[in-house]
Structure formats: structure tokens, C-alpha cells
Curated annotation (Swiss-Prot):
Keywords: Cell cycle, Cell division, Cytoplasm, Septation. PANTHER family: CELL DIVISION PROTEIN SEPF. GO terms for biological process: division septum assembly; FtsZ-dependent cytokinesis. Cell division protein that is part of the divisome complex and is recruited early to the Z-ring. Probably stimulates Z-ring formation, perhaps through the cross-linking of FtsZ protofilaments. Its function overlaps with FtsA. Homodimer. Interacts with FtsZ. It comes from Streptococcus pyogenes serotype M3 (strain ATCC BAA-595 / MGAS315). Pfam families: SepF. It comes from the Bacteria. This is Cell division protein SepF. It is found in: Cytoplasm. Residues 29-43 have a biased composition (Polar residues). One of its GO terms (cellular component) is cytoplasm. Residues 25-115 are annotated as: Disordered.
Length: 218
């Protein structure tokens, strides 16, 4: 019996050691499980914090964008005001320039018209030659493009004939025209003047029939 009791005691001793080891293993496993759970909780808490941080960053970006927009709007308004203020000035300047150009253009046209009229203006001179030397003065007027109305009533037939020959030759050289307009009157015209005279019957009373120029005899 004593041997059996000692044997049982030995068995129970070893059994208690195994139980203690098992308990220690269980405690260690529980200790390992607890930190893992805490780590999982911490890890799960971090994803919750990240969206919050993203949301805060988005709010900050939105505020910064609003501030930049608010800063841009006054500048845009000032630029529009400046454009609106400068536009009437530019419009007035354009109107003034157009008025000046129109007035200057009108003045230039007037000057050109006056010059052209002065250059194109034709003068008719009335001459009563009394001697042969007066024919040269009549030809000089033709050179400056003046019309000359010649009346030979104060000249003799021979002198008048010589004057007419000289004037007729000069008119042909200067491309003028010499036409009879009366019993003792002739019209000398330059090349830039056209003369249209209606035919008329000139009485030949008291005139020399043999004289080709129909000059009065005095």
C-alpha cells in the first residue's frame, strides 16, 4: 500500500506540472492574442483617421480656391471698368480723327478744285489791232491758252490780211483754231477749246468782193 501511495503521489505530481505548463501556455497564448487584437483595433482606427485627413485637406483646398476666386473677381471687375472707361475715350478719339480727316480732305479737295479750275479756266481777250505788230501780242495770248476775239475794223485791208496770215500760221503751229464770227471779227482759240459756231449769212454790202477775209474798206 505504501508503494501504491507513493506511486500515486508521483503521478499526481507530474500531472500538476503538466497542468501548470498547460495553464502557462494558455496564458501566453492569451497574452499574444491581446496585442494582436489591439493591433487590429489600432490598424482599423487608422483607416478611419485617413478619410478624415483627406476631408480636411479637401476643405482646405476648397477654401484656397474660393480665396483665389474672390481675389480674381475684383481684378476682373476693375479691368472691365477700365475697359468701359477707356472705350468711350477711344470712341471720342476716333470720332475726332474722322472729323479732322474729313475736314482736311474737304480742304484738300477745295484746293485741288480751285487749282484745277484756275488751270482749266479759259480767258477770252478782245483785241482791236491797229498795226501789224499787234499780231505778235495776239499770238502770245494763244501760247498761254487764251482765246482771242479779234476785230479788224480799225485796220486797212492790206494790213489786216498780213495780220491774218501771221495769226493763221501761228495757230496751225500751236494746234489752235481760227474761225470767222463776224464781218470783221475772228475768234482765235487754243487746242483745249472747241468752238461751235452756227452758220449765218453775212451781208456783203459795202465790202470788197475780191477780198477773201471780208474786211471793211476804210
Amino acid at each position: 500500500m505504501a508503494f501504491k501511495d507513493t506511486f500515486n503521489k508521483m503521478i499526481s505530481y507530474f500531472d500538476t506540472d503538466e497542468v501548470n505548463e498547460v495553464e502557462e501556455d494558455v496564458a501566453a497564448s492569451t497574452d499574444n492574442v491581446i496585442p494582436r487584437s489591439q493591433q487590429s483595433v489600432r490598424a482599423s482606427s487608422h483607416p478611419k483617421q485617413e478619410p478624415r485627413n483627406n476631408h480636411v485637406q479637401q476643405d482646405h483646398q476648397a477654401r484656397s480656391q474660393e480665396q483665389t476666386r474672390s481675389q480674381m473677381h475684383p481684378k476682373h471687375g476693375t479691368s472691365e471698368r477700365y475697359y468701359q472707361q477707356s472705350q468711350p475715350k477711344e470712341g471720342h478719339e476716333m470720332v475726332d480723327r474722322r472729323k479732322r480727316m474729313s475736314t482736311s480732305g474737304i480742304a484738300n479737295r477745295r484746293e485741288q478744285y480751285q487749282q484745277s479750275t484756275c488751270s482749266d479756266q479759259t480767258t477770252i481777250a478782245l483785241k482791236y489791232p491797229r498795226k501789224y505788230e499787234d499780231a505778235q501780242e495776239i499770238v502770245d495770248l494763244l501760247i498761254v491758252n487764251e482765246c482771242v476775239l479779234i476785230d479788224f475794223q480799225f485796220m486797212l485791208d492790206a494790213q489786216a490780211r498780213r495780220c491774218l496770215d501771221f495769226i493763221d500760221g501761228a495757230s496751225k503751229v500751236l494746234y489752235g483754231s481760227l474761225q470767222k464770227v463776224g464781218s470783221s471779227m475772228y475768234l482765235l482759240a487754243p487746242s483745249n477749246v472747241s468752238v461751235n459756231i452756227e452758220e449765218m449769212t453775212i451781208p456783203h454790202t459795202t465790202q470788197d468782193i475780191g477780198f477773201d477775209f471780208d474786211m471793211k474798206r476804210r
